[in-house]
Design a protein with these regions (language model features):
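The feature captures the beta-strand-to-loop junction immediately N-terminal to the Walker
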Residues: 35-37
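Conserved ABC transporter NBD signature motif
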Residues: 58-67, 80, 123-127
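ABC ATPase C-loop
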Residues: 161-162
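Conserved catalytic motifs of ABC-family nucleotide-binding domains
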Residues: 165
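Conserved structural motif at the start of ABC-family nucleotide-binding domains
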Residues: 4-6, 19
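Catalytic Walker B motif of ABC-type/P-loop ATPase nucleotide-binding domains
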Residues: 169-173
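ABC-type ATPase nucleotide-binding domains, specifically the catalytic core motifs of the NBD
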Residues: 54, 95-125, 142, 247
């Protein structure tokens, strides 16, 4: 059984039909890259998995560990172990790095107060583990998040999502706007997180960088899967890369 299975979903923004019978699966322990040109439906796919609205998922199912989560609230999906780092990062600029990381504890407590079952959740990941994964954040624990570089803010956004110890971490354009050296640092962190047991689903315009760390790749075009295979297969398939990714 796949950790995440998306089966034949149709998703809409209003009456705009974005995902058209899209199916994909993410296996536990892997790094899966979801690729495609701008407007192909990548972010819509992540939002559909995370329960964010819009889009409106009208047909098909999303299952996580065999449970149907298609119409669940975002908070309940997160409690089950699905984390999402959106493209906008959404760090709190007037709070320090450490205060941003502590917000995950507040989120967990709020869910408990709201009557959601958090009893089966793993404990929040210790800050020491996050600082080990992101040494730059360790050096800047007391620095305001708004004064961090773009790469450091991306690391903080990922670390904050990891604080909840998700089984599946979804990353929306983690390399956007980053210098090549910083991309290398973020890549190293993603691979380290994966080695420690967190499954990764990422979408990325920098196809070469994403393919270089992925185990499995999907390409979507106009809301449909047009390639599904191992990353090594896509590295060797120049025709498919040029046709759908322009690389």
């Amino acid at each position: 059984m796949s950790l995440l299975a998306v089966d034949d979903i149709d998703a809409y923004y209003g009456e705009s039909h974005i995902l058209r019978g899209l199916s994909m699966a993410v296996e536990e322990g892997e790094i899966c890259a979801l690729l495609g040109r701008n407007g192909a439906g990548k972010t819509t796919t992540l939002r559909s998995v995370a329960g964010a609205r819009p889009p409106d998922v009208r047909d098909g199912t999303v299952t996580f560990r065999g449970d149907d989560i298609t119409q669940m609230a975002t908070e309940d999906i997160a409690i089950r172990g699905v984390g999402l780092v959106p493209e906008e990062r959404r760090v709190f600029p007037n709070l320090t790095v450490e205060e941003n990381l502590h917000l995950s504890e507040v989120s967990r407590n709020a869910s408990n107060t709201a009557g959601r079952d958090v009893g089966d959740l793993p404990e929040t990941r210790p800050l020491s583990e996050l600082y080990e994964a992101f040494p730059r954040l360790d050096e800047r624990q007391n620095q305001l998040a708004g004064t961090l570089s773009g790469g450091e803010q991306q690391m903080l956004a990922i670390a904050r999502a990891l604080r909840q110890a998700p089984d599946l971490l979804m990353l929306d354009e983690p390399y956007e706007g980053l210098a090549p050296q910083i991309i290398d640092d973020v890549e190293d962190a993603i691979e380290r997180i994966n080695d420690e047991g967190t499954t990764i689903l990422l979408i990325e315009q920098n196809a070469a960088a994403a393919i270089s760390i992925a185990d499995q790749c999907y390409i979507i075009d106009q809301g449909q899967v047009v390639f599904d295979g191992e990353a090594e297969e896509l590295r060797e398939d120049e025709e498919t890369r040029k046709r759908y990714l322009g690389v």
